[in-house]
Amino acid sequence: MLVSPYGTPASFSTRNRNLIMETQSPFSRRKMLQNAGMGFGSLALQAMLSQNRLLGMQGTQGHHPAKAKSIIFLFMEGGPSHIDLFDPKPKLQELAGQPLPSSFKPIITPMGEYNAPLMPSKRSWKQYGQSGTWVSDWLPHTAQHVDDLAIIRSCWGNGLNHSNGVCQMNTGSTLGGRPSLGAWVSYGLGTENQSLPAFVVIEDDDGKVINGPRNWSAGFMPATYQGTALHSAGDPIRFLSAPKDIASERQNNKRKLIEALNRKHQADRSIDSELDARIRSYELAYKMQSEAPDAVDLSQESHSTLQLYGIDEKETAVFGRNCLLARRLVQRGVRFVQLYHGSGSRWDAHSGIEKNHSTLCKSSDRPIAGLLTDLKQQGLLDSTLVIWGGEFGRTPMSEKGDGRDHNSNGFTMWMAGGGVRGGQTIGSTDEIGLHAVEDRLHVHDLHATILHLIGLNHWDLVYSHQGRPERATQNEGRVCTKLIA
């Protein structure tokens, strides 16, 4: 069982009792004052160290042999429409313009559109690959990879709005404060590259993800495990680069002095493994000053590779660059890379879904297909789990005439690579795409399956917090064995 040594620190009263016992021994007054002084120093040091959110711990073994070594989560923020992308519904075409039939259980929607007329999909659909998987004309490039994809049409969650939907897909809970899935992976496995974080997050350049850092937070775990926001242009990690007027040798000497002071402070605290880990993290942060810029330096890539990701075209350049960065990061041993597309809920098509999704699909389809192609060419797809999806899907009922409302009762995600049996469609929604009805997979089930593929048993991945065992799946979830190769 992976149980953190940091989750149950000694209480303040325990520390006081220790001091009282020490005052009964020779030199107790000096010792007491020393401890008290060091206590204030410890508070200052802790404040400094708590700001270090860059690095995971040293790599460890999981609970069972892993199918995947790394994860790339392609998060389409705002809620892409499953019934216009991966889940064709002939019955919806037949019932177009009619109210929801009484045979379908109504749902609660944020905008109250459950009585609005049903809206058919305007997309054309085609079967692709040996698997004959249906994909709409909005995703022609991704469609070429269906034999590598396991398309899950029966996902569901509890988030009605973007804030709680995004929060649940990232942390398992609609309420903030819990560790993100990437943080659990970082906690359970650490990093393979001691010069890079275990968990990296890349947002769109021109948008801010709803909830912000809460989505990649470590919650009640040490901040070491949270995601590091990496920027695809300029300094990859803010405040990491050394000041331009300070020579590298001078900076290294200063770092060594601080390390020596920290080690002296630690001498009487040999059991404080968290302090030791934070001290070591400064050494790793120093290494990152050279490693991180190299990881984002795309000048090392060939022109054909840049074209593969669509970096040569305006519409696909930003997300294409981010997808290529994801490949470069997992190639360097980063465990979990999360890319946000449509940051700021731009997939949220309450109106004008044709224009909205046409634009967003065009900017993401080619880069995603390029990522899958490149991972396979580099021999990385078998060891990299690629996940695509958003916080929920969209309703078959119309909103404002030409849009769709939120639908967390049934939506589509897909996975590829890393132990996934591709070329299959798992589960289904009802005839109009409103409810998941067959092989339903809750967010907790998705998380349990993702953890399983990377070598972690979601029941055994435990962190002790305030005296109770906490799990990523909150004591729920089951692994979807159909998905696993």
Locate predicted features.
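Ligand-binding pockets and gating/stacking loops
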Residues: 2-4, 12-485
